[in-house]
């Protein structure tokens, strides 16, 4: 494998995971903050809020997992290795 392709693949894999984690991380923090605020306002709605929060966390975390899959594909099944 060309050393430039190998080095670029490693850097790209790192960027894929790093950038894929920024958005969901910020979104999870915001969602958790609003969930705590909502539970503080209406304690009787805690179950519904928590259920919606966990479901939204799952959807947000899937974006990070997609970034990890792209990084693993670049590292171990590199389509550019030729």
Curated annotation (Swiss-Prot):
- Give membrane topology per the record: Multi-pass membrane protein
- An MF annotation (GO) of this entry: lipid binding
Q: What is its main location?
A: plastid
Name positions with the PTM N-formylmethionine: 1
Q: Which InterPro entries match?
A: ATP_synth_csu_bac/chlpt, ATP_synth_F0_csu, ATP_synth_F0_csu_DDCD_BS, ATP_synth_F0_csu_sf, ATPase_proteolipid_c-like_dom, F/V-ATP_Csub_sf
Q: Locate the site labelled Reversibly protonated during proton transport.
A: 61
What GO terms describe the biological role, i.e. biological process, of this protein?
Answer: proton motive force-driven ATP synthesis
The family database entries (PROSITE patterns) matched by this protein are listed as:
ATPASE_C
Task: Identify the Pfam families for this entry.
Answer: ATP-synt_C (PF00137)
Tell me if Magnesium is a UniProt keyword of this record: no
**Where in or outside the cell is it found?**
Plastid, Chloroplast thylakoid membrane
Keywords per UniProt: ATP synthesis, CF(0), Chloroplast, Formylation, Hydrogen ion transport, Ion transport, Lipid-binding, Membrane, Plastid, Thylakoid, Transmembrane, Transmembrane helix, Transport
| TM ranges | 3-23, 57-77
The answer, when asked if Thylakoid is one of the entry's keywords, is yes
User: Which family, according to the similarity comment?
Assistant: Belongs to the ATPase C chain family.
Q: What else is known?
A: In plastids the F-type ATPase is also known as CF(1)CF(0).
Q: What does this protein do?
A: F(1)F(0) ATP synthase produces ATP from ADP in the presence of a proton or sodium gradient. F-type ATPases consist of two structural domains, F(1) containing the extramembraneous catalytic core and F(0) containing the membrane proton channel, linked together by a central stalk and a peripheral stalk. During catalysis, ATP synthesis in the catalytic domain of F(1) is coupled via a rotary mechanism of the central stalk subunits to proton translocation.
Q: How does it assemble?
A: F-type ATPases have 2 components, F(1) - the catalytic core - and F(0) - the membrane proton channel. F(1) has five subunits: alpha(3), beta(3), gamma(1), delta(1), epsilon(1). F(0) has four main subunits: a(1), b(1), b'(1) and c(10-14). The alpha and beta chains form an alternating ring which encloses part of the gamma chain. F(1) is attached to F(0) by a central stalk formed by the gamma and epsilon chains, while a peripheral stalk is formed by the delta, b and b' chains.
Quote the protein name from its UniProt record: ATP synthase subunit c, chloroplastic
